[in-house]
Amino acid sequence: HEDNAGIAVYWGQDAREGDLVTACN
């Protein structure tokens, strides 16, 4: 679960790029 929290933050930061947002979906 702790890993998920770290990933959430990671995706959140890169979400601005818009690239990883597509990968996350």
Swiss-Prot record:
Signal sequence annotation = none
Keywords on this record?
Answer: Alpha-amylase inhibitor, Carbohydrate metabolism, Chitin degradation, Glycosidase, Hydrolase, Polysaccharide degradation
Top-level taxon in the UniProt lineage: Eukaryota
What is this protein's name?
A: Chitinolytic alpha-amylase inhibitor PvCAI
Supply the source organism for this entry.
Phaseolus vulgaris
MF (Gene Ontology): alpha-amylase inhibitor activity; chitinase activity; endochitinase activity
EC number(s) on file: 3.2.1.14
Outline the subunit composition: Homodimer.
Recorded catalytic reaction(s): these are:
Random endo-hydrolysis of N-acetyl-beta-D-glucosaminide (1->4)-beta-linkages in chitin and chitodextrins
The similarity comment for this entry is: Belongs to the glycosyl hydrolase 18 family. Chitinase class II subfamily.
Functional summary from the UniProt entry: Alpha-amylase inhibitor, active against Z.subfasciatus alpha-amylase (ZSA) but not porcine pancreatic alpha-amylase (PPA). Has chitinase activity.
